[in-house]
């Protein structure tokens, strides 16, 4: 091989790494891999002087660009580097595995190396059965240590030296009865802690200490057999315990420790110097051993060990860090691997990337919501690679030859050479060849990835379309700032340009902004109208906004409309209302969405009502068009799809911006000044509050204030005062807003929702209000006062933080000081919680990153372990869930059930004469009576509904009737309303039969079962596996119950009055939308769950709040509570129980008694003062306060008792212990003084209780004295013993329950007679402190029965629940506690994300902490995943020591190795259909001569149109394949039917199997009113789709169609064509062989077998394409002549619109519905009717919105034969 010859780059695909095997290199392996022995500490800077040492040079000298390796003769970077090795003079410890060496030594005999366990014992195998690796070694060491401890403690039964011979009998690998071991006494080994830290093992034997160095330990480990090593968890083939001690040290190549060159100087790496030091110390030790001086040997050995240890880890506790100079520490191998900037996390898990840009962002309301404004400088620097082919060669050549933007930067040739175009003098002669790759500039319409850090959730990285603009900042639409959490105060964002078509396709299909309008976190929109656009919408739709013709025409141009609606006012001049203008933007939707939400028609224009796309009343506010669940954004997304939402947002922003530019809006000082009437009312509020505070203070001073449960008097006072002051601010805010005039700019912004609240306007104009710190008033901080300016002990409102002035007037100095105190708290919280929540989210991501949805519908991790049978227990996508659906079924009583669901039939099963009444068709009633079985079916329906009611009452968490709302994937109520408004007539009688309704609803439920994936489904669709069938039935149970109660036959007939067409449309919609809601296989739902739980945590505060005014139960909230739960903390700060009570203790009065019985109470807790008094005479006490009661007790005492008492007192101590009890606490606890006396005597009988005062005495005292006279030692002894005694005297309650508080809950009961359900208030006990085990035992009440209902009693301490009740109970409790932690801050996260997190924590049967102690201790995750989280080197060392193997299945492992992760689009493999490939049309034949088709760029525009111009455009269509279909496509320029037309594509040979999309395209001009989309990818369902829209659908689907239509660069996407475009009908000739019966497709049909791509429902006449030689016509019986004339169609010719917005008024032509029985083909020239319809088709202009709206497909179009054919 010639020196320095570079190897050619291989074109072969790299093999994928399937697994990684870890092991520790043995001595012979290190030597075999090395190229030389390193014996001299030389840098070999001058390689020429080291002749004869070539191998040594390649170890020491780093390669330069001109030099070649002396070993392999390759140049940099082809040379991989070569190892050397150092032969150590003595073995040394590897600091990374030193702890493992200690564990092994504890397991084996130090003399013979045998295992210190009897492996024949069953207990040994039982404990080691399920543990491997490090956990196994720890378990063996634990058992061996316990065995040795037992042996030494029972020496009488032992053998030699106190050790049982049993552990050495019959070990592994030995025959039965064979004897193992030497029986030697075993020293105790531990780490040596000397004056100077070192790696030495301390061995203690017979009280003599010895130091074992590595050579001694190596000798012991060398005697360990392979079988014993295997039992300890080692793999002897990978790592024997002897290999843990180093005898040979490998020297890494210079590529690992490159030198730094600067000018002519070179500086070696720190590791190089450390290796040199090791070589020097090693040589010195060898020389010292030859000299045989022990002191020198010890010193050299210690230095060698230290240098080797710090070479591996320079941050350990064994040695002081080695420094390379006075300040800088050595960066060892460990420091280079671990940490955020180490090799794993810094260079493998995350990398720096090319083709990215970063700059400041600014807002721009004139670009689309899915666009990003890119500066020219960025667009000319970033490039996109396009491969040259026959299709795009001409266009790319023009790019390459241009010298100004848009141009190209580089050309990559197939031979590997690169042409830099900027260096060419003459670029006009550049030629391109097929196969070249041109890196062209980023141009308008390119798809890029936009990101803002921190990337907390999926919506922080979204795809945008490029809009190249002037200036130097990224321009962002304001509606996109919410998911990015961005503002324009200097934020910077990152832009990434995809570098492949696959990446671009994934961006378009999954990451574009419209795809992410609805967040899976809250199942609600994360984007909406904000800021100025929201304010403009409110003012535009105000009831007194009227607009003239000039303004409305301007708006029409913005919206690309050419026909105005009829003005609301005609005289004296035409005026349009703002609501009419806003209606031009609205698609055909209804709001409120469901009938039960519909309010009565308001007279004050206060309620928004939208019907069929017309805003009838009400102003548009944030709740209507903002990012809120159930808003207009949400409804449009569910009804019409994401693209329609984008159109709506873009239209609103353009119109409102134009409106504000013309009408203006400003805020001035006059808006902040309150009038005299408002100031007077505010002053009255302040005076009223001040008097109220004074009353509370007076009541507290008089001790008459009602104390709250568990609170002291001072705490109750503070709670009442703080509550009164906060109410004062709220009341003032409401009055301030109501008194402000309607035109006040602040009020307008507040009511619109664009900025501010009523509290803000109150603080600005009136007063700021009470300032709180940590949820309470400003505390005393300066000698019993808040500030030196106030009196001592001033508890008034002014001195404790009340600010009585507003911002306009200005705060007083002390008010300003208090105000800054409250603000500082928020700043500190924000600073502290940022790091905590960021680390919390990282832990969540690591724990859940491998959890994904599998193709069988289950949820699994990387090892295919089952996490859930169904994602979220229902298998649905969180973004498709609709909340807020009322569910009144559980609250219906028997009478309401009968009125709503039951028909009029007798008990004997015969219909009464009233059946059907006025809501059933007479023919249906006659048919119903004809068959006696019909009654039975109706009875079964009612029985099923009654059973559903009972099931829902038992299973659901019931609330009030108006609050019980369901979260389901489909909103049937809205679909029913849509069906009624489009197909039904309110006055008509339904033509449906109840039996038909019941059968169709049951059929629908069976169809829903078939939508779920399962591997056990037979050919008939039935699932034969019981478990698989049950999980699907369980997922559908709640939805089926809701569906049955909504679509009960009587409700459909009587309440909805649906006809057959509307009912079949409704069922089809429900099925389709449910199918769309199923989660996608491969979805990384674990990461979504982690983001959904981690991102809202940033909105939490870190404080532990004291709920003032509610109870004194201290609860941990926010991030600390989350950390407690996720870390599975066993020492919770505020653990508590909820104790349920048996009747009658669940009533309030009895619950108070139970409260005292449960709360733990000792004598210490109720004792206020302890006195020691010398009082030897019991009859004449020296305490004056006790004389009366003592005299009373002596008088009632018998003489014998009195004499006995006197004798005891005389013999006892003269010192009396006087306990003064807290009267209030004794009263609260309901304690009897006799009980206290008995409790004292139960604990200690050495005391005489002289008196316990009677219960009716105001002062409660106890006098007690010792029975023994200790003389002078009495007082010290009493002072020592009495406090301990008081703490031990247990009066009542459960130990551990520090406080018990009453808590009321609602329990629903059912009246069996009427079936009515009512809620009753019952009382339970909330405790501070937990003792669940003791609570389960119970507490006996006054009647001698247990008062605690253990079945309903729970603790918030999850580990305690797990230990007592098992893992399932712990899972349920963990789920409940997580939800409550988020709900405390108003964060309502979708239920399915909690379940993923909780099931992952509990999946192994124990609670796995989401921390390094849980994730890195799990055996299921591989070493690569664990080391990428934390403890990098520790994990890798353990993996190598125990020979672990990583199967490379997880996300982290694949990222480390550069593989595609097996989630998402990487979960499946694609198989190429070679047969279909043979039928593909070649590129050269598919493209017309001289024409260029843009395959790579979504814009599809000419080069000149990419240059900045005044004509805006909106590219939208996706990439398509470079093939065309059999249709000839013509374009006309101009309006209303221009005269010029030119074909832009040639015809391809006709292929019947590939004409589906083309056929839909051809027929779309005629049947666009019938096009009905049911697919999320093709989102025009329910709205008339224009021909240009249908083309957009066509081009989007063309990626799946081998023969698809491709428009020229002039033809833009649907957004560039409005429905005002003209559709020109062209003639063509059809062959006679075409059949009238056309193929069709179902919603679940897949395109070309790729994935599960849903296609829209298409009427039969649109299902196939006519050949180029055919003409298509349609007639229908019963249609009018004018309607039938519109049915004549051929290829359409859309006309370009002059503006860039694609909006139109719907209903521009009547709806036509045709069945396939009325479709026929006619030969060209077969007598086409010539009449006025020709002029209509060529000069068509849309008209205003008319009552004849486009109706959804008819019932006939949803025939059963369609599904049968599918």
From Swiss-Prot:
So what does mutating residue 131 to M actually do?
A: In trypanosome isolates
Q: Where is the composition biased (Low complexity)?
A: 1742-1756
GO molecular function term, any single one: DNA binding
Which terms under GO biological process does the entry name? DNA-templated transcription
| EC top class, as a word | transferase
Residues that coordinate or bind Mg(2+) 2: 487, 489
* PANTHER family according to UniProt: DNA-DIRECTED RNA POLYMERASE, DNA-DIRECTED RNA POLYMERASE II SUBUNIT RPB1
Name of the protein described by the UniProt record = DNA-directed RNA polymerase II subunit RPB1-A
